[in-house]
C-alpha cells in the first residue's frame, strides 16, 4: 500500500492518503470539532453508462443499503441514526458516493462504529433478488411496484423535468 501525506492550510494536521494495489484510496483527514464523516467515493456514474444499462449506477447505489451478510436491511441505518447520524448516498455523472456523518462520541466510539459498518456495507453488500423487480417499460407510468428498480426510475422521472436538471445536463457533457 502506497502512503502519501498532504498539507492543507485549513487543517491542523496532515492528510494521509493510502492507495491500495487495486487503486482504492483511503483518505484520513482530521478536523477540529465534534463531528466525523466516513465516506466512499466510487468512480462510476451516468457517464459510464449506455442506452442499455442507463441508470445502473443509481440503481446499485440504492441496492447497497439492502443489508450485508452481517447486518440485515435497515440495521445499518438504525444503529447509526440512533446515534444522531445522517446516512445517505448520491450518484452523479462521474461518481457515486456513500457517507455517514455523526457526532464523534466518547473516545471516538461512534467514529469507530461508523468505519466498521460503512466498510461492511461497501465490501459485503447483499442484493436480494426480490428488489430487482420484473422487467417493464420505462415509459409506462402505470407501474406502481415499489421495489428499488422502480423507485430509481421514479426518481429519474421526477428530476428529468426540473429546470436545474436541464441546466446541469446542458452544461456538463
PLM feature spans:
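His/Glu-rich zincin catalytic helix
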Residues: 1-78, 99, 116
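Acidic/histidine-enriched segments that form metal/cofactor-coordinating
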Residues: 69, 77-173
Amino acid at each position: 500500500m502506497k502512503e502519501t501525506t498532504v498539507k492543507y492550510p485549513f487543517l491542523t494536521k496532515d492528510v494521509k492518503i493510502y492507495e491500495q494495489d487495486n487503486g482504492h484510496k483511503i483518505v484520513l483527514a482530521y478536523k477540529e470539532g465534534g463531528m466525523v464523516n466516513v465516506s466512499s467515493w466510487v468512480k462510476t456514474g451516468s457517464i459510464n453508462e449506455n442506452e442499455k444499462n442507463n441508470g445502473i449506477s443509481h440503481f446499485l447505489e440504492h441496492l447497497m443499503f439492502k443489508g450485508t451478510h452481517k447486518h440485515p436491511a435497515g440495521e445499518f441505518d438504525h444503529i447509526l441514526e440512533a446515534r444522531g447520524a445522517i446516512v445517505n448516498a448520491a450518484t452523479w455523472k462521474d461518481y457515486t458516493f456513500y457517507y455517514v456523518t455523526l457526532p464523534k462520541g466518547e473516545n471516538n466510539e461512534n467514529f469507530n462504529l461508523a468505519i466498521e459498518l460503512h466498510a461492511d456495507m461497501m465490501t459485503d453488500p447483499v442484493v436480494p433478488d426480490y428488489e430487482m423487480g420484473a422487467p417493464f417499460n420505462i415509459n409506462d407510468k402505470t407501474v406502481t411496484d415499489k421495489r428499488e428498480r422502480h423507485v430509481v426510475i421514479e426518481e429519474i422521472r421526477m428530476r428529468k423535468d426540473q429546470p436545474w436538471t436541464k441546466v446541469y445536463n446542458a452544461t456538463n457533457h
